[in-house]
């Protein structure tokens, strides 16, 4: 039998005897509309929901709907803000607390909280940091909203950028790029879908890497520790890797049985 894993939210809801509902879609969903209307709630808080809240739902609570969005709005509206921030080598990442309006991520913002982005941070680590930050800040935010103390300021829509959904094929590395951009891509796509290269028809996913000091032709393997040359007389050193169909490995263990050796050329396609 397949076991269905409960989400942490479902688990805590059941423990505390709080209603837990999981509608696949809210659009034209009369049941959920009437459920929420009957609750007569003060405020709705939305985090990483992945669907547009229909306009008719937005009037069902006294103080509207607010969203915790994982970017410094108006930058990186949309589906993959954390990944795009890391890929873009942004100096800061953050969360924005905004009122939900009909257009996606366009509502006025009451507060933005930032953290410095270290360029060895991956998407999983940043997601965890921002989740903790959001959990810490939202309680005061809710109090301010309920007491009419929160000030929501319109976004500058002319400065908006969009964090489009990640496509798996974006993970393929281009050795004609510079080292910082390659590391940014590796970190932004960990753990999913992962940055990768193809060698002799097999896919190798890079889980962790750092900037190296070697110089060579783009795609050339410069050492038996899997240091690979890229553009601008730069290189990256791979620290953890996963061969297609295999478990993740530290690079020392991986290289013992690998057909990738010093002098191998890894192409872009």
Can you describe what each PLM-predicted range is?
Residues 1-191, 234, 243-245, 262-269:
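One-carbon transfer enzymes
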């Amino acid at each position: 039998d397949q076991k269905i894993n409960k989400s942490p939210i479902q688990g805590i809801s059941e423990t505390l005897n709080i209603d837990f509902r999981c509608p696949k879609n809210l659009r034209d969903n009369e049941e959920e509309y009437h459920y929420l209307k009957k609750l007569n709630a003060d405020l709705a808080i939305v985090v990483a929901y992945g669907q547009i809240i229909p306009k008719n739902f937005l009037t069902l609570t006294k103080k509207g709907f607010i969203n915790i969005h994982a970017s410094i709005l108006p930058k990186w509206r949309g589906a993959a803000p954390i990944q795009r921030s890391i890929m873009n080598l942004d100096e800061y990442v953050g969360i924005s607390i905004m009122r939900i309006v009909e257009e996606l991520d366009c509502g006025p913002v009451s507060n933005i909280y930032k953290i410095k982005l270290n360029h060895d941070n991956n998407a999983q680590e940043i997601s965890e940091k921002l989740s903790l930050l959001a959990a810490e800040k939202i309680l005061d935010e809710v109090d301010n909203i309920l007491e009419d103390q929160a000030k929501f300021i319109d976004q500058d829509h002319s400065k908006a950028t969009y964090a489009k959904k990640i496509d798996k094929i974006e993970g393929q590395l281009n050795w004609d790029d510079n080292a910082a951009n390659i590391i940014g891509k590796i970190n932004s796509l960990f753990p999913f879908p992962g940055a990768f290269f193809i060698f002799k028809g097999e896919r190798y996913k890079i889980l962790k890497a750092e900037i190296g000091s070697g110089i060579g032709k783009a795609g050339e393997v410069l050492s038996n520790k899997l240091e690979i040359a890229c553009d601008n007389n730069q290189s990256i050193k791979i620290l953890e890797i996963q061969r297609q169909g295999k478990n993740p490995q530290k690079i020392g263990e991986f290289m013992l049985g690998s057909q990738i050796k010093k002098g191998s050329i890894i192409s872009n396609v």
